[in-house]
Amino acid sequence: MSFPFKPVLLAAIVSQTFPAFAADPVPQAHQDLNEVKVIGGRKAQKLGEEKVRRQALDKQMVSDESDLVRYDPGISVVEGGRSGSNGFTIRGVDKDRVAINVDGLAQAESRSSEAFQELFGAYGNFNANRNTSEPENFSEVTINKGADSLKSGSGALGGAVNYKTKSASDYVSEEKPYHLGIKGGYIGRNSQKFSSITAAGTWLGLDALMVYTRRFGKETKNNSDAADTVITDNKQSWNPNAGSTNYGSRGVARSKPDPQDWVNKSTLFKLGYNFNDKNRIGWIYEDSRTDRTTTELSNMWAANWKGEALGDTRSRQDISYRKRIGFEYKNQLDKGPWDSLNLHYDRQTIDMSTWTWDLPTDYASNGVNSDVYHMFRNIRQKNTQFGADAEKQIDFSKLVWAMQYGLGGSQNDNDNRDHSYWVRLYDPKYQTSNNQELTMLVESSSKNRFAYWNNTFQFGDSSQYRLNAGLRYDNSSSKAKDNPNYTPAIRGQIPYLGSERKHSGFSYGLGLDWKFTPRLNLLAKYSTGFRAPTSDETWLLFPHPDFYLKANPNLKAETAKNFELGLAGSGKAGNFKFSGFQTRYRDFIELTYMGVSSDNPNSPNYAPISDGTALVSSPVWQNQNRSSAWAKGLEFNGTWNLDSIGLPQGTHAGINLSYIKGKAKQTNGQETPINALSPWSAVYNLGYDAPSKRWGINAYLTHTAAKKPSDTVHSSDDLNNPWPFAKHSKAYTLFDLTGYVNLGKYFTLRAGAYNIGNKKYYTWESLRSIREFGTVNRVDNKTHAGIERFTSPGRSYNFTLEAKF
C-alpha cells in the first residue's frame, strides 16, 4: 500500500476500536463536541459539518483564519499576498467557490478571475482579496465541507464558512445581569499585540453587547537563511557570498518578507428589547478596518540583477473596511404556522482599497521640491439583504417532523474609484498635478431572490432513523452600469454589453442518519451547490490591440454535486467519524483564447473599439464555461478519552486526517491535475485537562505530505507541464504545544509554542501563490532565487491573558 493511504489504514483501525468501549453516550466534560440540535430526544450526526465554539476559539488562541483551521486538514487558507488572505480552500476549490457568511450575510467577492489576474493582479495596484473578519466578534464558526447551497447560497461549491456573532444572551441572564471580559495577548509570528473588551448587560427586558478589539503588528516572519542562493542573468552569475551587501535586500531575489506595519480596529454593538417571552426586536452595528503599510522591497523594479537599488522605492497602504447595520424581529407562537420566526434586514458596505506611492531615489537632493506620485484604487461592494426564516416542529405518535422554511433577497452594487496625481513629498496636501479619475473596471449591480424549505423526519424505535430533505430556489440577475469616469475605450463598450442577465436554479439536500446500534450511526448525504458568475467574470473587459478581453454576460452558473457516506460512533471512551466523499463540478469559468479578432459584428470574435471601428487580427480572450472536475477523498476525526484504559481522568488523544485527489476534465476530454487540491495531512493530539478545570496542556503533531509536481498543472494555457515551483514542496512534520491555567476565579493565562522544532518548510498554498509575470509576489523564474521569502514561520510563541467578571 502506498504511503498516502497509511493514515486511512490507521483511521480504519481506530474506528474498529471505538465500538468496543462502553456505551454510555454522555460526553466527558473536557470533550469539545459539535453543537447539535436535539429533536425527538436524540442528537443529530452530520457529515461534512464542524462547529467551533467560543470556548474552542479561546483555547486555540485564534487570531485569524489560519489559526481557525490550523488543526483541520480538510480546509486551508488561500494566500493573498501582502494584504492578507483570500478566502478558503475546501475539496479542490477556493476563493469565491467557498462561501463566507457572517450571520447569513454574504461577504465580499474577490477579484480573482484569471482575466483580472492577467491584467491587473500581477502588479499589486488593487486590494482584490476577500475581506476578513475579527475572531473576537464570534460566538461560533460552522465549517461546511462539500457543496451546500441549500444552507449557504451562491458560492458554496466546495463548502462554506459561516460565522455567528456574539449576543448578550451568550453572557448574561436574569441570574447574571452583567458581564465584563478583558483580553490581551501577543502573537509571535507577526509581532502582533492585541486587546479586546467584551461587555454585556440586561435590565428590564433590555440587553446590550459591545465588543471592541484592536490589533497591531508587523509582517509575518519567515524562516530563511538564503546562504546558498546564486542568481544568474543573461551575461554572468552573481554570487552573494562574493561581496554585495545589497544582494537579496531588494528585488525578486529578496529572501525576507517586505517590511510591513498594520493596525486593525473592530467594533461590534448589539441592542435588543424583549417585549415579552414571545416578541423581541434587535439592532446590530459592526465596523472593522485594517490598514497595512508595506515597503515593497521585493517589487521586480526595486533592484537590478545584483539586488542593488534600481530606482524609486514603492510603498503601499492596503485598506480593508467593513460596515454593517442590521435589524431583526423575533416571534414565537404556541400554535400557528411557525414555532419561531425571524425577520431580518441588513446593509453592508465593504471597501477594499490600495494607496500606492513611489519615493524617488533623488528626493534628498531635490529637497522641498521633490514630488511623489500617488495612485489610489478602490473596490466598493454594497449589499442590502432581507429575509424571513421560520421553524416548525410537529410531533406525531411515532414521527417527529421538524421543518425550516423561509425566503429572502439581496441587492448588490459593485463600484470603483480610481485616481492618481503628484504631490510634494514634504507636504502631501499640496498637489502638483491635476487629479486624474479614470477607472478600467466595469461597475455592476445585481439582485437575488430565494426561497427554501428544509425538513427533518425522525422515526423508529428510540428515534432510530433521521431523514433530511430540503429544496431551495434562487433567481438572480446582473447588469453593467455606466460611469463617466470609465476610460474612453471602456465606455465605448458599454452599449455592446446588452441588458440584464439572469440566472436561476434549484439546490437540493438529502441526508440519512441511521442509529443501527446504541453506539454507531450510518450516515449518508447528497447535496448540491452553485456559484453565480462574479462581477469581474461577467463584465470585465479590456479593449486593447495586444490583449482584447471581451465581457461575457452569457456565462452560466458553476454547479456541484456532492455524495458522502460515513460511520460515526460515540461512547464513554470517546467519539469518531469516518467518511468518504465524491464531488463533481461542472461549468468551471476559465479565461479562454477565442482566436484573432474580426470586424464582422456577427462574429463571436468581433472586437469593437471606442471610435466605432473594430480591430482585426488582434488576440481575443473571454471568460467561458469550459471544464468540469471531480474530487474524492476520505476524512477521519476522533477523540479518545484515555481514562477509559486506566490513565488519569482528563487525559485524551485525538486524530484528524484528510486525503483527497481529483482531476479537471477539459473540453477535449483530457484529464488534468487540480492545483487547488491540498496534499494529504494528519493532525495527532495528546492532551490533559485537570478534573478541577484549573489547568490543561495539549500537544499537536501535524504531518503534511508533499505536493507532487505530477499532481499540478502549469496553467490553463499549458496543461502538460507541472507548476514550476511545486518542486520545492516537501513533506514536513510540525510539533506544537499549548496550555492554559486558571488563575483564581476570574483570570485565565494561555500560552503556545508553535513549530517547536523550527522546521523550515513551504506550504502548498504559499508556493502556488507565486507569480511568473508581473511585478509582485515574484521570484527569479530561472533560478528561483527569492523562493525562501515564501517559507513559513519558524519557531514562535503566543500568549493571552483573559479576565472575566
Set out the residue ranges of the language-model regions.
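Acidic, small-polar-rich N-terminal luminal/periplasmic segments of exported/outer-membrane proteins
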Residues: D24-Y171, S298-N299, L565
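Short loop/turn motifs that connect adjacent beta-strands in outer-membrane beta-barrel proteins
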Residues: H30, S152-G153, A168-Y178, G205, ...
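Outer-membrane beta-barrel signature, preferentially recognizing the C-terminal barrel domain
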Residues: K306-G336, S444-S446, Y496-S507, G511, ...
